[in-house]
Regions:
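Short cytosolic helices in intracellular loops of multi-pass membrane proteins
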Residues: 250-260
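ABC ATP-binding cassette signature C-motif
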Residues: 1-251
Length: 260
């Protein structure tokens, strides 16, 4: 469970969020929407503990692993496949521990690390990384090419795959469909529907939000407004809410006019 309680967020002298609260339940797929500059990416930074609050609190379970899309992809000699596998930091850490343990001649330690590697899916990580790359449109030949060979759009696909391969409890995706063709978007939708953690997506692609989201959080008037359902459900509920507010306002105005 993620609790966002009465937070205030500023960018310079500009207040982005004020007394804003929301609760996000585990295993939900949430679309985070709002006008450009309203604070969506800033909220992601807060969830990743990279930005402090003026007031309020954000509570995320301490044992949760968080994965997100990196914004930069350096041009490296490292192959695309190897770059993606780096996304599973637990696997890479265990490999380093195994390498160190092999010099210690400690049989118990080696057995423990091998057991942890098996639990971490070490024996399927290459096939899982390949499946992600193929799903995102890379060919069998391309996955073994250096990352420096790819254009900016394809490097963003690499970063997306790197975020997906990371075992996570909370997955934060900022505009994941940018640079993707329709077939790849459909593949990504299928993958995300099978994801068992909590998912929060920033996207301007309404069809994508419709197909993926179980909930919507809208940033409006510096508040976090929560809705159950996909984007289309949000639009209907918001329209109904605005109509009720308008009717109430008109009723109040009529009452004031009669009192004059």
């Amino acid at each position: 469970m993620i609790y966002i309680n009465n937070i205030e967020v500023m960018r310079g002298t500009n207040v982005l969020l004020s007394e804003a609260s929301a609760t996000i339940f585990p295993q939900k797929r949430v679309g985070l929407i709002g006008k450009n500059g309203c604070g969506k990416s800033t909220l992601f930074a807060i969830l990743k503990n990279k930005l402090s609050l003026e007031q309020g609190s954000v509570t995320i379970p301490k044992n949760w692993l968080i994965s997100s899309i990196e914004q930069e992809t350096p041009g490296l000699e490292q192959t695309a496949l190897d770059y993606i596998i780096d996304g599973d930091t637990r696997y890479r850490d265990l490999c380093k521990q195994l390498e160190d343990a092999e010099h210690s001649n400690d049989g118990n330690l080696l057995a423990s690390i091998h057991e942890q590697l098996e639990h971490a899916g070490a024996y399927t990580i290459k096939s899982r990384a390949e499946a992600l790359l193929f799903g995102l449109g890379f060919s069998k030949e391309e996955i073994n090419q250096p990352t420096k060979n790819f254009s900016g759009g394809w490097r963003m696909r690499l970063n997306l795959a790197k975020a997906l391969i990371c075992p996570s409890d909370l997955l934060l995706l900022d505009e994941p469909t940018n640079h993707l063709d329709l077939d790849t978007v459909i593949w990504l939708e299928g993958w995300l529907k099978r994801y068992t953690g909590t998912l929060i997506i920033i996207s301007h692609d309404r069809d994508f939000l419709d197909n993926i989201c179980t909930h919507i959080i809208q940033i409006e008037n510096k508040k976090l407004n929560s809705y159950t359902g996909n984007y289309s459900s949000f639009e209907k509920e918001r329209a109904q809410r605005m109509a009720l507010e308008q009717a109430l306002f008109e009723k109040q105005q009529n009452q004031l006019n009669h009192m004059r």
